[in-house]
Swiss-Prot record:
Protein family: Belongs to the tetrahydrofolate dehydrogenase/cyclohydrolase family.
Reactions catalysed: (6R)-5,10-methylene-5,6,7,8-tetrahydrofolate + NADP(+) = (6R)-5,10-methenyltetrahydrofolate + NADPH; (6R)-5,10-methenyltetrahydrofolate + H2O = (6R)-10-formyltetrahydrofolate + H(+)
Protein name from the UniProt record: Bifunctional protein FolD
An example Gene Ontology CC term for this record: cytosol
Binding site for NADP(+): G164, R165, S166, S189, T230
Assembly behavior: Homodimer.
A GO BP entry: purine nucleotide biosynthetic process
Function: Catalyzes the oxidation of 5,10-methylenetetrahydrofolate to 5,10-methenyltetrahydrofolate and then the hydrolysis of 5,10-methenyltetrahydrofolate to 10-formyltetrahydrofolate.
Molecular function via GO: methenyltetrahydrofolate cyclohydrolase activity; methylenetetrahydrofolate dehydrogenase (NADP+) activity
PANTHER family documented for this protein: C-1-TETRAHYDROFOLATE SYNTHASE, CYTOPLASMIC, C-1-TETRAHYDROFOLATE SYNTHASE, CYTOPLASMIC-RELATED
Coiled-coil zones: none
Keywords assigned: Amino-acid biosynthesis, Histidine biosynthesis, Hydrolase, Methionine biosynthesis, Multifunctional enzyme, NADP, One-carbon metabolism, Oxidoreductase, Purine biosynthesis
C-alpha cells in the first residue's frame, strides 16, 4: 500500500504558526478580521462559510458577513466591495461562489481589492503569480505546495501532470509547480491521450471535479497522487481519484476527506494575516 499523505499534520504545523502570529497582533491591539460576502442562498457555500467561521473563531480571527439577495445589481455589489476596501478594520474579503448569473457574467470579483483578496482570485494577483512576483496565492494550489514541502516531496525536474485547468486550481497550481522547476503538463476534457499522460507522470494531480475519475489504469507504480477533488456521492465526500482502487499501486496518495481540504482553510488564514501586514504597512 502506498504512503498516505495525511493533511492533518500539515494543518497542525500551519495552525501553530498562525496562532503565534495572531498572539503577536493581539499585543498590538489588532484582531484579524475577515468579511465573507455571499449572494443568494446556496447550501454548499453556506456550509463552507460556517466551517471557516468555526475554525477562525477557534484560533482568534473575527469573521463578519455581508449578504446580498440573488437579484443584487452589479452597481450595488461594486459599491459594497468599495466600502469594504476602504474599511481598515476589514483585512480580507472572501467572495463565496457561486454568485448570481448576472454577477458571474460580469465577472464581479474583478472589483475586489487585490490587497484584500485572500483567495488570490483577482486578475492582479493571478498576473503577479504568473510572473513570479509576491502576491496572494490561491488557497487550494498553495495547500498542495504546503503538503509537498511538509513531506519533502520535490518536484524539481519531475514530470507533473495536472488534470484540470480551472482558474482557481488547475492553472495557478501549474504555475506554482513550474516556478519550482517541474515539467508540467495540463490535461483537460479535450486531451486525447489522457491515460498515457497520467501514467507517465511522476506526480499526478487530480483537479477535474469528477468523482473517482482517476482509476488504477491511469496511474503507475510508485507515483505521487494528489487528489484535490471534493465531490459528494450518496452523502459521502469523495475525491477525483478512486482511492481504494489505486492506493495499493501508487507510492504516495492524499485521502479525501483528510487531505488537501483541511490544509486549504489554514492557507486562507495565512493569507489573511498577510493582508493584515499589508494593512499595517499602509497605515
Amino acid at each position: 500500500m502506498g504512503v498516505i499523505l495525511e493533511g492533518k499534520p500539515v494543518a497542525e504545523k500551519l495552525e501553530k504558526e498562525i496562532k503565534e502570529k495572531i498572539e503577536i497582533y493581539k499585543t498590538k491591539g489588532i484582531i484579524p478580521n475577515l468579511c465573507i460576502v455571499k449572494v443568494g442562498e446556496n447550501e454548499e457555500a453556506e456550509a463552507y462559510a460556517k466551517s471557516i467561521e468555526r475554525f477562525f473563531s477557534r484560533i482568534g480571527i473575527n469573521v463578519e458577513r455581508k449578504n446580498f439577495a440573488e437579484n443584487v445589481s452589479l452597481l450595488e455589489f461594486q459599491k459594497a466591495l468599495k466600502e469594504l476596501e476602504k474599511n481598515n478594520k476589514v483585512h480580507g474579503i472572501l467572495i463565496l461562489r457561486p454568485l448570481s448569473e448576472e454577477l458571474e457574467r460580469q465577472k464581479a470579483f474583478r472589483f475586489l481589492s487585490p490587497d484584500k483578496d485572500v483567495e488570490g482570485i483577482t486578475y492582479e494577483n493571478l498576473g503577479k503569480l504568473f510572473v513570479g512576483e509576491k502576491c496572494f496565492h490561491p488557497c487550494t494550489p498553495q495547500a498542495v505546495i504546503e503538503l509537498l514541502d511538509f513531506y519533502k516531496i520535490s518536484v524539481e525536474g519531475k514530470d507533473v501532470v495536472v488534470v484540470g485547468r480551472s482558474i482557481s486550481v488547475g492553472k495557478p497550481l501549474s504555475i506554482l509547480l513550474l516556478n519550482r522547476n517541474a515539467t508540467v503538463t495540463i490535461c483537460h476534457s479535450k486531451t486525447k491521450n489522457l491515460e498515457e499522460l497520467t501514467r507517465r507522470a511522476e506526480v499526478l494531480v487530480a483537479a477535474v471535479g469528477r468523482p473517482h475519475f482517476i482509476g488504477k489504469d491511469m496511474v503507475k507504480e510508485g507515483q505521487v497522487v494528489i487528489d484535490i477533488g471534493t465531490n459528494v456521492v450518496e452523502g459521502k465526500l469523495v475525491g477525483d481519484v478512486n482511492f481504494e482502487e489505486v492506493k495499493d499501486k501508487v507510492g504516495y496518495i492524499t485521502p479525501v476527506p483528510g487531505g488537501i481540504g483541511i490544509i486549504t482553510t489554514r492557507v486562507l488564514a495565512m493569507n489573511l494575516l498577510k493582508a493584515v501586514e499589508k494593512n499595517e504597512a499602509r497605515n
